[in-house]
Amino acid sequence: NDAYGIPPITAFMHGGEQENGFRAGTLAVHNIVGFGKAAEIAIRDLKANEQRIMQLDQVMVSGISTIPGISLTNPSEKRLPGIISIVVDKKDFNNERFIKNISDKFALSTGSACSAGEPSYVITALGLEDRVSKVLRISLNKYTTEEEIHQLINILKSEL
């Protein structure tokens, strides 16, 4: 162990002396170059993508606000643009059934990403534990179109 009590690093792959014996085999230069180029593009487009997602977020939130019975779990300006959590206040609405029915069109989720497959501590902290089956999380990205947003809004309207 080192001075901090951390055990020494062991080899990831055995058989060669590349990377000071920590990794065997020739490095995949094409993957390294591809990753570097992807990072370069991501950095180059960061501001434009951020602006686009903020614009799409406003379109989605505006559309959702026109649907009676649907509310944002966090309408605050402090929420991250592009991640929209809503509660559908319809008696027989079940988020998992709804997601399954539209999974060929949209990728939605229940609750928070921090607790996939379990009751979300975020939803509980917001005081929504009794409505956990009515929460949907909508995530937008640079590939989301306004047409898709309007389609989802129309599907949500038809659900209520």
Please identify what each model-predicted range represents.
Residues G15-Q18, A39, M60, V88-K90, ...:
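Glycine-rich beta-alpha junction loops
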Residues V29-E40, V61, I99, S120-I123, ...:
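Predominant activation on well-ordered alpha-helical scaffold segments within soluble catalytic domains
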Residues I83-R137:
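Conserved C-terminal alpha-helix-loop-beta "cap" of PLP-dependent enzymes
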Residues Y121-L160:
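PLP-dependent enzyme catalytic core of the Aspartate aminotransferase-like
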Residues N1-K47:
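Conserved core segment of the aminotransferase class I/II
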Residues T10, T73, A107-S109:
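Structural detector of well-ordered beta-strand residues that form the stable sheet scaffold
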Residues I43-D92, E96-N101:
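Conserved PLP-dependent catalytic core of the aminotransferase class-I/II
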Residues A24, A28-I32, L46-D57, N95, ...:
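Generic structural signal for well-ordered, non-membrane alpha-helical segments
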